[in-house]
Amino acid sequence: MGRFIFVSFGLLVVFLSLSGTGADFNCPPGWSAYDQYCYQVIKEPKNWDDAERFCTEQADGGHLVSIESKGERDFVAQLVSQNIESVEDHVWTGLRVQNKEKQCSTEWSDGSSVSYENLLELYMRKCGALERETGFHKWINLGCIQLNPFVCKFPPQC
């Protein structure tokens, strides 16, 4: 009997400790949750600037998606694959080449630096998109005026 109570208590402790790893927030209807953020694929094609503006209008802290890890990359690729028609070749991310003080640097539209890189090809174009030919797992730089669907991301509000 004592062993049963001990094991039951241990399982309860494990369950409670795991319950705070991402399941303690809710995203709005139509949004998907991953690692403390909410994501949504927007199918209506827009140029990069209009897509970023749209994302910032959806929620506080909203931006085009930044991808900070392989796990997040896989999540976003699956989300895009499930929601984008087969005719779409590219999907905007928040990746943008900035020309600051005559030095090119790449950063995300939310202001974070690029800590995880997964570029397929680096062209002299300024805006980053996911590439269909790679299952939306790799990024390519495109001209920012091109019209593409996109992914928005925001931290949920408490």
UniProtKB/Swiss-Prot annotation:
Pfam family, any one: Lectin_C
Main localization (coarse): secreted
Tissue specificity comment: Expressed by the venom gland.
Domain of life from the UniProt record: Eukaryota
Gene3D superfamilies xref list: Mannose-Binding Protein A, subunit A
Gene Ontology CC terms: extracellular region
Family matches, as InterPro entries: C-type_lectin-like, C-type_lectin-like/link_sf, C-type_lectin/snaclec_domain, C-type_lectin_CS, CTDL_fold
Cystine crosslinks: C27-C38, C55-C152, C127-C144
Compartments where found: Secreted
Signal peptide region: 1-23
A GO molecular-function annotation: toxin activity
Domain C-type lectin: 34-153
Keyword terms of this UniProt record: Disulfide bond, Hemostasis impairing toxin, Platelet aggregation activating toxin, Secreted, Signal, Toxin
Function comment: Agglucetin specifically causes platelet aggregation and surface exposure of integrin alpha-IIb/beta-3 with a GPIb-(GP1BA-) dependent manner in washed platelets. It binds to human platelets in a saturable manner, and its binding is specifically blocked by anti-GP Ib mAb. It regulates endothelial cell survival and promotes angiogenesis by activating integrin alpha-v/beta-3 signaling through FAK/phosphatidylinositol 3-kinase (PI3K)/Akt pathway.
Assembly with partners or alone: Heterotetramer of the subunits alpha-1, alpha-2, beta-1 and beta-2; disulfide-linked.
Protein name: Snaclec agglucetin subunit alpha-2
Species in which this protein is naturally found: Deinagkistrodon acutus (Hundred-pace snake)
